[in-house]
C-alpha cells in the first residue's frame, strides 16, 4: 500500500492508497483506492469523509493535471485512515 495525501486543484486533500496510471513512461493520472476527503476542524482535529460519497466506486481515477502535490501523511493520520477503511465508521475524527 502507498497511503498518500493527494492535494487537488479543487483545494481538496484526499487520503488514499495511490497508484500511478501510466501511458508508456509518462504518468497520465493516479488511481485512488478507498479515497477519503480530509477536513480540518477546530483544535487540530481531522475529519474523514468519503470522496464521492454518492458513488459505490472504491477505485477512482484522477488525471495528473488535477493533482497539485502528493505528500506523505503523518503517522497518526495514516493510522486513522487505515482504521476508517477497515469499516469501523463512515466519518471519524482524528
Stretches found by the model and what they are:
Residues 1-94:
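Conserved RNA-binding domains used in RNP assembly and mRNA/RNA metabolism
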Amino acid at each position: 500500500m502507498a497511503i498518500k495525501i493527494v492535494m487537488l486543484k479543487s483545494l481538496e486533500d484526499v487520503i488514499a492508497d495511490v497508484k500511478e496510471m501510466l501511458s508508456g513512461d509518462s504518468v497520465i493520472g493516479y488511481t485512488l483506492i478507498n479515497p477519503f476527503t480530509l477536513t480540518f476542524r477546530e483544535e487540530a482535529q481531522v475529519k474523514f469523509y468519503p470522496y464521492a460519497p454518492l458513488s459505490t466506486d472504491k477505485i477512482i481515477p484522477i488525471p495528473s493535471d488535477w493533482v497539485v502535490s502528493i505528500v506523505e501523511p503523518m503517522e497518526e493520520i495514516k493510522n486513522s485512515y487505515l482504521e476508517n477503511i477497515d469499516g469501523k465508521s463512515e466519518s471519524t475524527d482524528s
